[in-house]
Amino acid sequence: MALLQIAEPGQAAAPHQHRLAVGIDLGTTNSLVASVRSGQSVILNDEQERSLVPSVVHYGVEEKKVGLEAFEQASLDPKNTVISVKRLIGRSLPDVQSRYSSLPYEFVASENGLPLIITAQGPKSPIEVSSDILLRLNHIAEQRLGGELSGVVITVPAYFDDAQRQSTKDAARLAGLNVLRLLNEPTAAALAYGLDSGQEGIIAVYDLGGGTFDISILRLSKGIFEVLATGGDTALGGDDFDHLIADWVIEQTKLKPQTANQQRELITLANQAKITLTNEKSAVISWQDFSVEISREQFNELIYPLVKRSLLTCRRALKDANVESEEVQAVVMVGGSTRVPYVREQVGEFFGKTPLTSIDPDKVVALGAAIQADILVGNKTDSDMLLLDVVPLSLGIETMGGLVEKIIPRNTTIPVARAQEFTTFKDGQTAMSVHVLQGERELVDDCRSLGRFTLRGIPPMAAGAAHIRVTYQVDADGLLSVTAMEKSTKVQASIQIKPSYGLTDEEVTAMIKSSFDNAQEDLQARELAEQRVEADRVIESVIVALQADGAELLSTDEFHHIETVLKQLMDVKQGSDRDAIAQGIKALDTATQEFAARRMNASINKALTGKNLSDIENP
């Protein structure tokens, strides 16, 4: 199969013109910025030669601090110090309050129900906080590179939905950045390893950061990067390890934090203990008047359920990719939390091989994003690399009977556009409602609604005569647009899917699993619904035919017989016996065959009345 070379928007017009571009890893705990210099992707350090910028913003009465300076204010002024804002972006206020009730911030709702954090500098949205972090990274980049940036590639977790992706782009625009592309974090890591280490074959990218977990199964071959399957958990990361240690300390000392400052101090101590346990067999935590020692074995026992949860997600991703674990040739470790020895040990046992850690797991995502940014601005015009991300959940449309017709199946590579034709259900129908859905189940009630719109202006026709073409298009950033067009008049309507908030953590992890758990029941429910829809169609057409021609073409006994069979089908349709409905449809079809033939003959006779044979032969 031939591969097409596709020029990306924003490429340099002149091949010799070098444009400044960077890759940004906008992380939950830390963020980094990288660029390609002299053909190599490198991390750009700040003025103190620090590569990691804590994803923290402090909004003081007189000044705003970003990064390490802000992090140092976390225990002193927690209400005005925003950390892990990536967990909040694209979420509703009720979702944030239910999921993160321990956060020290005061929240209010914006006009559209999104969370605003009350600070000394006024209410701040997660988009604004993220924008301040991006501004800091932009400043570091322009100071190091000595010029203005032409564009940036920003990485996001593979499981970020439309709302979270759009919010990330909005934050970048607020910071004055030209976003070339949003890139899935595991894909960026694979890109970095593919160029630096020359890996080919099936690769698993295990990405455990501060706040999110992602697993991607990729095929790398001759410069082509293809994501076969993805999985993830937007509420699993190193922060959760910290909270487990903190809870353990509370259990040991019987002392609970009484203030937000104490809570933040305890979390900081837990984080320091976790880092110590990476290299040492034990760590001492001094909390208030107590000192407790936690061993690496105790720590491993605490985090075991979370590590196991990540491996179950890996198992599902392998199944989606139709790949056995022994087929995986390499396992790439990404994210600072993969430094935990127990994580590396368990991942190695699961895949049956020692994970790759030759590139700093904290930096690999930013390095890969920088390579992609360099290509997108046209600095690497001879690149034959093709990078293919995927749709993580199927996208579909509601059809009659509450069924879901999948237009773009999950794990389809993006960007992608798919179209399908639909028709009207009733005679004279002049409008059609388009209900856009996301998920793997067969029924509308079991999937997530993304949006609705109505196509109006359909010419009145007989049921089934109109042709409405519905097109689903997902761009390179994973954002969806849907268009419906009536083919004869070209009248159309469309929608861009930008939900006001994202999936809850339970929904993200449960949607795919539920499709497996309920596969048999879903199939039976779909078949029953399809039979009911067919019964409705037959009933509707018979009623219309009886009203139009029954009195003229049928005897009284024939009319009553069809009515009786019709009522029997209407009754049996209310039940859940699929076979009985099918038999009822067949019985009504048999009962109306002679009636249908008479209607056809009457229609032909009417069309021929008053015409000569020559008129028919030579129209």
Curated annotation (Swiss-Prot):
One of its GO terms (molecular function) is ATP binding. GO terms for biological process: iron-sulfur cluster assembly. Gene3D superfamilies: 1.20.1270.10, 3.30.420.40, Actin, Chain A, domain 4 (3.90.640.10), Substrate Binding Domain Of DNAk, Chain A, domain 1 (2.60.34.10). Signal peptide: none annotated. It comes from the Bacteria. InterPro entries: ATPase_NBD, Heat_shock_70_CS, HscA_NBD, HSP70_C_sf, HSP70_peptide-bd_sf, Hsp_70_fam, ISC_FeS_clus_asmbl_HscA. Keywords: ATP-binding, Chaperone, Nucleotide-binding. NCBIfam families: HscA, PRK05183.1. Chaperone involved in the maturation of iron-sulfur cluster-containing proteins. Has a low intrinsic ATPase activity which is markedly stimulated by HscB. PANTHER family: HEAT SHOCK PROTEIN 70KDA. Belongs to the heat shock protein 70 family. This is Chaperone protein HscA homolog. It comes from Haemophilus influenzae (strain PittEE).
